[in-house]
């Protein structure tokens, strides 16, 4: 109640089901910890509410060594299917908040794909930074995985989306992932890292990975390579390169060179925000003039609301959400084996 008062939030509930009983609410957003995603989504769908779902759609939430990765795959896909079935059963729309899909640089890539008519042969994508500060992210029990799931869901979702888009544009059928190979590691737990002060990287990981790499093979034989790590200094990296049969497109969501600034002392910039997760404001920086817009946050909200209003599916919805979970947990199987 104190939080609600501070931010002028008119209604407070201690049970989400009470909120879902309200007849004046048509659409709910679920910005909650990953372990609550699928249960809240099913409850919302059963209440007839349309849903905006944070990434990833769901996962398997257990101690990292309690189950085999195959068992985790089965649990995660079961949870995902429960959400899909609830949405279909209740005829509600789920907007999957994969902002890479809506980022203006990726939207431009789609238009360039349309113009060129080329085939996507090789996709290379990354999201990396110096580590999450959210305590729940450090345990498999609450997060469902480490960097491969928590951050990898962004670039993996993006490359899946682009191949879906290509297939639908050319043949009317999305091109799906056929297989995946992957590796993961806990690089901040290495002996050399343990001995090294100061720690510029987050090191409080318990049983989740802080480094991951995956190679996806699609049904048409084309490839995507995805990196997701918590061992990358210098701010958030949201990058994608598309190698087409007749062109190359480099997408820089973060960092990008729309604004470049230099200061010998970080204090010169005072409290002015530069960009997310930089360890210092000194030296050359890449201040984003409108970080939310460049990452696609307003655009995804607009599409989700319009989809509900118009009774259509959003650009990023259940098919992408479901396949992303399937691919990531298949990647965990590969990494274990």
What is the meaning of each model-derived region?
Residues 9-16:
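Conserved SAM-binding strand-loop segment of SAM-dependent methyltransferases
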Residues 31-35:
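N-terminal glycine-rich "phosphate-gripper" loop used for MgATP/nucleotide binding
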Residues 89-93, 100-205:
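Predominantly a Rossmann-like dinucleotide-binding segment in NAD(P)-dependent oxidoreductases
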Residues 26-27, 38-99:
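Beta-strand-loop-alpha-helix segment that lines the small-molecule cofactor/substrate pocket
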Residues 157-263, 298-310, 329-331:
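Contiguous beta-strand/loop segments that form the cofactor/metal-binding neighborhood of enzyme cores
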Residues 27-29, 69, 89, 290, ...:
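C-terminal helix-rich "cap/oligomerization" subdomain common to oxidoreductases
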Residues 13, 53-54, 94-96, 226, ...:
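Hydrophobic residues in well-ordered beta-strands that form the structural core
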Residues 1-7:
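N-terminal Rossmann-like dinucleotide-binding module
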């Amino acid at each position: 109640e104190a939080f609600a008062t501070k931010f002028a939030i008119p209604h407070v509930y201690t049970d989400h089901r009470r909120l879902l009983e309200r007849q004046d609410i048509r659409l709910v957003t679920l910005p909650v910890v990953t372990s609550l995603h699928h249960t809240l989504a099913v409850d919302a769908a059963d209440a007839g509410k349309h849903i905006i779902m944070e990434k990833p759609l769901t996962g398997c939430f257990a101690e990292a060594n309690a189950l085999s990765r195959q068992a985790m795959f089965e649990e995660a896909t079961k949870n995902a299917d429960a959400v899909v079935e609830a949405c279909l059963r209740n005829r509600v729309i789920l907007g999957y908040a994969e902002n890479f899909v809506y980022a203006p640089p990726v939207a431009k890539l789609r238009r360039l794909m349309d113009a060129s008519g080329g085939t996507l042969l090789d996709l290379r994508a990354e999201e990396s930074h110096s580590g999450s500060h959210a305590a729940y992210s450090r345990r498999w029990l609450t997060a469902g995985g480490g960097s491969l799931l928590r951050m990898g869901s962004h670039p993996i979702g993006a490359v899946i989306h682009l191949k879906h888009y290509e297939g639908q544009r050319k043949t009317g059928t999305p091109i799906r992932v056929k297989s995946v190979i992957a590796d993961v590691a806990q690089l901040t737990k290495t002996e050399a890292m343990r001995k090294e002060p100061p720690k510029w990287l987050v090191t409080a990981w318990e049983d989740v990975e802080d480094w991951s790499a995956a190679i996806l093979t699609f049904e048409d034989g084309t490839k995507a390579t995805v990196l997701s790590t918590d061992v990358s200094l210098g701010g958030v990296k949201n990058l994608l390169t598309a190698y087409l049969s007749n062109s190359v497109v480099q997408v820089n969501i973060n960092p990008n060179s729309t604004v470049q600034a230099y200061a010998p002392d970080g204090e010169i910039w005072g409290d002015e925000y530069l960009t997310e997760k930089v360890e210092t404001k000194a030296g050359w920086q890449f201040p984003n003039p409108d970080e939310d817009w460049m990452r696609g946050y307003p655009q995804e909200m607009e599409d989700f609301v319009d989809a509900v209003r118009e009774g259509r599916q959003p650009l990023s919805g259940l098919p992408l959400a479901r396949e992303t979970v399937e691919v990531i947990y298949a990647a965990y199987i590969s990494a274990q084996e």
